[in-house]
Amino acid sequence: MKVWMAILISILCWQSSAWAVCPAWSPARAQEEISRLQQQIKQWDDDYWKEGKSEVEDGVYDQLSARLTQWQRCFGNETRDAMMPPLNGAVMHPVAHTGVRKMADKNALSLWMRERSDLWVQPKVDGVAVTLVYRDGKLNKAISRGNGLKGEDWTQKVRLISAVPQTVSGPLANSTLQGEIFLKRKGHIQQQMGGINARAKVAGLMMRQGNSDTLNSLAVFVWAWPDGPQLMTDRLKELATAGFTLTQTYTRAVKNADEVAHVRNEWWKAKLPFVTDGVVVRAAKEPESRHWLPGQAEWLVAWKYQPVAQVAEVKAIQFAVGKSGKISVVASLAPVMLDDKKVQRVNIGSVRRWQEWDIAPGDQILVSLAGQGIPRIDDVVWRGAERTKPTPPENRFNSLTCYFASDVCQEQFISRLVWLGSKQVLGLDGIGEAGWRALHQTHRFEHIFSWLLLTPEQLQNTPGIAKSKSAQLWHQFNLARQQPFTRWVMAMGIPLTRAALNASDERSWSQLLFSTEQFWQQLPGTGSGRARQVIEWKENAQIKKLGSWLAAQQITGFEP
């Protein structure tokens, strides 16, 4: 009982972290939002089951279906069964499809495995489930999974799939098999190639009329033989002899969750003949098939791969002003996990880009990780019924504004502080945006170099700055005084690359002020436009004032 309670707690914790808390909607708003998403998913279902086509990626469909279920539970609505096909003309399964319960993580799987023995792991092949019925050694019937009890008659279609054995012998001559019809792939690497919408593609081929040639792009992976041989090894051997060789090749004995994790990771990176979305762990000992019912299989569980992309709810739209004055837009998200990384924010880009995306709080966006693990937006997959977008700040900033603090300059001023403290400029180790905000809020800096005047006592008494850290900061601020002249000029935002600035051989502020446009233009990577920007920069009143202030502080290169 304790083990089962631990598993239940693990699942509930996962669900509460994977799904956001209930939205703060009025009953009327909740009804409207639920109804709209319900109608959209119904339309996708109709397209999928009646037309054999999909207008949405499998992963997006699954996650939005989960989101709908969450909303329905939050507001007391009746929940729906995902992917429930129409049952007109449906055929009864000889043995019900149970489905498979999903484990949240390795710990949950370990708890489940602890009370079981003779366990085996298989790939969770991504396709559509099917029942194959053999009578007197011949394929008698093929039935789609449907609702687990009834499905569509796919016999004629499956008979056209050359990879499915049409005749069998021995123990299989009168048998019922359950498996997955999948899209044949050559060297599919799940980690690199993802799901490629395989499930929808298979469904499309099985639902369309007159496509006998294309059906040969399909095959079947048998994962269950109800009432088959008691020993898994015997089952695998008989299946392989009959032509279902993949089952034997991709079924391995496992003793614990560590071994499952090893195989799962191996198959995630290996070249496989099919698309997968995780692994299934099953006990060799199964109840008699007459006891099988949808949703009640206690002898097998799935551990799915983390989706490459996650659907996330936009909680807020925020605007940031960079050191150059450019306004960027950031979406604040309900937390999602991507490759073991908790993602709560994603950069949208410029205001124009944000307007093109048309993103508002309450929308659902598809987020993945780009190079170096940086979150990016792949798509807007659902827009809320009520959409209120914030007004961006006026575009009054540029590369020569906000060296001195003011209310309207708050964001660009902080961005300048973050820039000058970075490793490539003054190298103020141990302070980031939050630290600069705390210092500025407490000590009300006049300009971007005012921190040079802070005393150890002031730093120690700054809310948000730990006392143990204040001494380190004061030491860093003092060390900055010894940085080369070019580093200070970079901190002032000179519109030159470091390479160009080093090539200029400027060693003093007075020398820099007297340099002409022609001088700057001859530097590597500096054209006439950039040279004019340098002239505008050094003639700016705020820059001159900062230069004089640094001279008074006896910073290297600025002394008279």
Swiss-Prot record:
One biological process term from GO is: DNA repair
By its UniProt entry, which Pfam families does this protein fall under? Answer: DNA_ligase_aden, DNA_ligase_OB
Recorded catalytic activity of this chain's protein: NAD(+) + (deoxyribonucleotide)n-3'-hydroxyl + 5'-phospho-(deoxyribonucleotide)m = (deoxyribonucleotide)n+m + AMP + beta-nicotinamide D-nucleotide
> What is this enzyme's class at the first EC digit?
ligase
Enzyme Commission number(s): 6.5.1.2
| Function summary | Catalyzes the formation of phosphodiester linkages between 5'-phosphoryl and 3'-hydroxyl groups in double-stranded DNA using NAD as a coenzyme and as the energy source for the reaction.
Q: Which family does it belong to?
A: Belongs to the NAD-dependent DNA ligase family. LigB subfamily.
Name it. Answer: DNA ligase B
Source species = Escherichia coli (strain SMS-3-5 / SECEC)
Q: Which gene encodes it?
A: ligB
